[in-house]
A protein has these predicted regions:
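Sequence/structural segment immediately N-terminal to covalent heme-attachment motifs in c-type
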Residues: 23-40, 55
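Short, solvent-exposed mixed-charge patches
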Residues: 135-136
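Sec/Tat signal peptide C-region and signal peptidase I cleavage site
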Residues: 15-22
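Bacterial N-terminal signal peptides that target proteins for export
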Residues: 1-8
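Axial heme c-ligation environment in periplasmic c-type cytochrome domains
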Residues: 36, 42-56, 68-124
Length: 136
């Protein structure tokens, strides 16, 4: 009996912790299944959105104040922007969320294509939210 009560308390704690993290996510992220692979602060299957925001907002940045992982990804994104003729990191991130794929982040599972299942306006709104997490 004691074991059951302890298990129930632990389960309730996990549910509450997950719901707090999920509440921070925009409704669009929950509605479109983004939270299955992403959170704002921690890597799940894909990178944490705050890390994505830092890297994409630091494209072209230099100096020792930049986190090495963020710097490495931002350098990759800079090269990708040139290679694909994208004018802004936002344009590339919108394409990445729409079409899926791998290549920007290290040791992550490939992102599934989200378009046309997720509306273009929703993708743009989510990208705006992600990039807004860490402004330059």
């Amino acid at each position: 009996m004691k074991t059951i009560i302890v298990s129930m308390i632990a389960a309730a704690g996990l549910v509450m912790a997950c719901s707090v993290m999920a509440e921070d996510m925009p409704v669009l992220a929950r509605k479109n299944g983004c939270t299955a692979c992403h959170t704002i602060e921690k890597k799940l299957v894909g990178p944490a959105w705050r890390d994505v925001s830092k890297a994409y907002n630091k494209v072209g940045a230099t100096g020792t104040a930049v986190d090495p992982k963020v710097y490495q990804v931002s350098q990759k994104v800079s090269a990708i922007l040139k290679e694909h003729g994208k004018a802004t990191p936002e344009a590339w991130l919108i394409e990445k969320v729409s079409k899926g794929g791998t290549g920007d982040w290290f040791k992550h599972t490939a992102m599934i294509p989200n378009a046309p299942r997720v509306k273009e306006a929703d993708i743009k709104a989510l990208v705006e939210f992600i990039l807004g997490l860490e402004k330059k």
